[in-house]
C-alpha cells in the first residue's frame, strides 16, 4: 500500500451543475511499526454531495501474521469520528420553516468503527471488511421524532490473482462485492495487464452503473501514478458524461527500493 497516498474523486464530474457536483477527497498515511508485524495509519476522507458534507477521521491498526513461507494474514481495525454537516443556504424550500431542518442540528459528530481481514501472497489475495459498524441516528432538526435516518454497516468482499503470461507480462483479474442493506448488492469486475510491474493498463465493470478504463506507472521505487475514466451506463448517463480519477502514491523510507505496488495489485 502506498504510504502518503493522495486520492481525489469526482463521482459525477460531468454533471452540468457547477459546484454542486458530488466530490470526494481522501488522504491516507501508513507506517510499519516493526518488521512484518504491526502497522498503524491515519485516514482522512471528505465527501460533498449538494448541501451535505461528510468528513471521516480514522486511525487504523493492523497486525500481519506469517502463516506460511508464501502466505500472510492481516487483521485490522479503524476507529474515529464522522462529521456530517448540512449547508441550509444551498437549499431552496417551498416552506422556509420546513420542520425537517428548521432550527436544526446542522453539524453532527458521530463515532465510527470498522474491521477487516486480508490474506495475501505475492500472487493472490482475498479479504473482507465492514465499515460503519456502529449504527448512528442522523437528523437535521431540533426534534429527532420528525425526520430521522440511520447509518448502516457497509460490507466489502474482495479477491484478486496474478496470472503470469510471460516473464514480463501478467494479467491481474480481481473482484469487489459491496453489500449495503437495503440497497441491491453490487460488484466491480476488474482486469489489468502489467508489464514488469512497472506500468499497467486495464478495464473495469461496475454492475448496473459504469465501465472504466485505467492506466498507471511506477515512476520510481517511491512514486506511482494511476488514472482511470468511468463511462456511465446507468440512468445518470443523461446528465453525466463520465468520471475522471487520479491517484498519486508516495512510498516513504523505502529502504529496500521495492516498487509500490510491488506485485501489481
State where each predicted segment sits.
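Subset of outer-membrane beta-barrel
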Residues: 1-265
